[in-house]
Amino acid sequence: MQQVVNEKLIEYAKKYNIKLVCTNDVHFVDEENAEAHDRLICLSTGKDLDDPNRMLYTKQEWMKTREEMNEVFADVPEALSNTVEICDKVEFYSIDHAPIMPTFAIPEDFGTEEEYRKKLTEKDLFDEFTRDENGNVVMDEAAAKAKIERLGGYEKLYRIKLEADYLAKLAYDGAKRRYGENLSEEVQERIKFELHIMKTMGFPGYFLIVQDFINAARHQLDVSVGPGRGSAAGSAVAYCLGITQIDPIQYDLLFERFLNPDRISLPDIDVDFDDDGRGRVLNWVTEKYGQEKVAHIITYGTMATKLAIKDVARVQKLPLSESDRLCKLIPDKLPDKKLNLPNAIAYVPELQEAEVSPNPVLRDTIKYAKMLEGNVRNTGVHACGTIICRDDITDWVPVSTADDKETGEKMLVTQYEGSVIEDTGLIKMDFLGLKTLSIIKEAIENIRQSKGIVLNIDEVPIDDPATYRLYSEGRTIGTFQFESAGMQKYLRELQPVRLRI
């Protein structure tokens, strides 16, 4: 069929004076990978190797060299020339990009970018973004110019400055709610320092977005939100914005563990929502920023050593007992070496015997398992990572779709996995669903219905002697982060009587 199509393509190209190009359908890298690819197709289609009706390829789908392509298409040299022409036009580019911060809608009565462009000069911005929070010069001119460039130039700085000022307003409003109208010098200095770091690293928009969906979850969607976890708990600004419920000043937590200008990296705030409400928060975010601007992150499941053996053995119909025997020969770890099939074979004599076995099915199982080990076996969706983009996601990265397990609807998924996404500059937010929060929420409702008491979990005292007795006895089954046998044992040894960090 392909031959017939090719002949017609050549005919039409000449008839209508259209340039013809030649391509090669590539599914694997080298010619010797053809048989391994054949077995991979059997796995993906659920067929056995000896099934006459299974999907078959020509085994010519390796990435051919220039010489091989010239030989295959020797009868249409003009198509080869046209292909080279396209190749010469392909532009090399890097996917690495500065952070692509989503646009947070700031009320116009607070200020606009246009107003900021009129009232601020580039010199004003240069000084503000390259000096410390007290206006002191802290870097030479070359380093200062490099920093302005890294932030996206003055065109971006006007937006960052507007977001930073609005963030400061929200932070100080929140600080008065947390600490009272008259802020202590310590609180003022801490907030001033943190806001300056957030601004000069280019991240005020990030905090505006996070506080926005957290406050929407709490006050609009009736979703329980965790008090905060990880290094974000060290931020007083996050505490004032309602992102966290832990006072870092009271507990002497370090902000520098969270954001540090000497270690340029995107902020990473893990936000816990109750299991039942997480989906509602994601829907709210999608509706606010647009379906084309919000995507989940793909995950790639690869074939581990034992799985590669089992999969190849299955399609080749190696007896299950023999497949199990091979898998049991794989050690859990190897001394001073990475655990993979070639290293395991070098370490285990029985695997060496299987590799040269007179039984061709056994021998081929080892041979092709070695080739397929580490290959992508399936794809999934990151449990909590979600991208919110300034533009349509497709403007920046390739996407696919996946089924939402909760709603059954299609959702966008990036084709780059998490380790690559940060390099592209896309902003990842972590929306975690926590069963513990659902249980606490249900308990509070049960107390309200049975006792008539309206309980605020954020105001529960942390100095209750009866609670500490439970912890000291290790009676923490079902308690988040304290339910493992090891933690219960440690609590019995520690005998905690107070909470201090």
Which residues fall in each region the model found?
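Alpha-helical scaffold/interaction cores of sigma-54-like transcription cofactors
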Residues: 1-501
